[in-house]
Regions:
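N-terminal Rossmann NAD(P)H-binding glycine-rich loop of SDR-like oxidoreductase domains
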Residues: 3-23
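SDR active-site strand-loop-helix element
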Residues: 6, 30, 62-66, 103-109, ...
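Catalytic helix-loop patch of NAD(P)-dependent Rossmann-fold dehydrogenases
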Residues: 76, 83, 87-91, 98, ...
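Rossmann-fold cofactor-recognition segment
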Residues: 32-48
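NAD(P)-dependent short-chain dehydrogenase/reductase
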Residues: 141-191, 197-198, 204-205
Length: 292
């Protein structure tokens, strides 16, 4: 297939585009950031720009990764969050609708409130706790209301990108242990890590099935940030570093976080398409391949 990808320069895009290419798909990579070779400029917030590019490329599929994923920035700048995550998604969706193109929308387990004790599945009702989750959920609703052929795939705590792109928890912890021997990490929020490489492989398999719909795709198992930090220290071979568990109140942040973002890939399992491994094995591979 000829696949146009938005947000290609980010954590996920840097793993997904090569995965698609290795499977024989022709990838047209786009992003606001064109520092990497082979990436075409695209700001999804501008409808005419999106529509013109889709008409010009005539892809078989558009994979929409472009998003504002900084949860606190979304809370502090809600107009920016909705303009990027909701209106940007509407622009891509309308362009796909006009050309009858299949669309893939990457969403988040953060669309749930986080108060249930069982892992969330595709059949649970969303109720976002923060602006980021609301803006992504609005994107889901737009895709579902305007298209018949789509994949909406929710990811969990994303890990990947290496030193160049990983500005999230894992990258921060690895950078901290270069300077500190005592760290603190939150233990009262639980989630499902999602390795970009594994997610990309699973997504590539899914889009070749024609099983359109809404899916969860996270690595197997659940953990707290504290659990992740302990594993990072172990995998980095730093027995001299210790991490102390703290409550989330220790780190006051603008945006509320869900108590639980535990996810299960229920529909993928029912379809026999869930090949996501344990999060600890995925984390070890990520650290060994990108941080050592």
């Amino acid at each position: 297939m000829k696949i146009l990808v938005t947000g290609s320069a980010g954590m996920l895009g840097s793993a997904l585009c090569p995965t698609l290419a290795r499977r024989g798909h022709k990838v047209i990579a786009t992003d606001l950031n064109t520092i990497d070779a082979g990436i075409e400029y695209l700001d999804v917030r501008g409808y005419e720009q999106v529509d013109d590019l889709v008409k010009k490329i005539k892809p078989d599929m558009v994979m929409h990764l472009a998003a504002e994923t900084d949860v606190d920035k979304c809370e502090l700048e809600p107009d920016h969050a909705f303009q990027t995550n909701s209106i940007g998604t509407q622009n891509v969706t309308l362009a796909c609708q006009k050309q009858n193109i299949v669309m893939v929308y990457i969403s988040t387990i953060g669309v749930f409130y986080g108060d249930q004790f069982e892992p969330y599945s595709e059949f649970d009702n969303p109720n976002p706790i923060n602006i980021y989750g609301r803006s992504k959920l609005e994107g889901e609703k737009i895709v579902q209301s305007l298209l018949q052929r789509y994949y909406i795939v929710r990811a969990g705590w994303m890990m990947g990108g290496g030193p160049k792109r990983d500005k999230k928890f894992i990258g921060k912890i690895i950078n901290q242990i270069k300077e500190k021997t005592i760290l603190k990490a939150v233990h009262d929020k639980i989630g499902s890590p999602t390795y970009t490489v594994d997610f990309s492989k699973c997504l590539t398999n899914l889009i070749e099935t024609g099983y359109y719909g809404l899916y969860h795709c996270t690595n197997e198992g659940y953990c707290s940030r504290f659990d992740v930090a302990k594993k990072i220290i172990d995998f980095m071979g730093r027995p001299d570093v210790t991490v102390e568990p703290v409550n989330s109140a220790y780190f006051p942040l603008p945006a509320a976080r869900a108590r639980s973002e535990m996810s299960r890939n229920y529909k993928l399992k029912l379809l026999g398409k869930d090949a996501m491994r344990n999060w600890e094995d995925a984390l070890k591979e990520y650290i060994d391949s990108c941080w050592k």
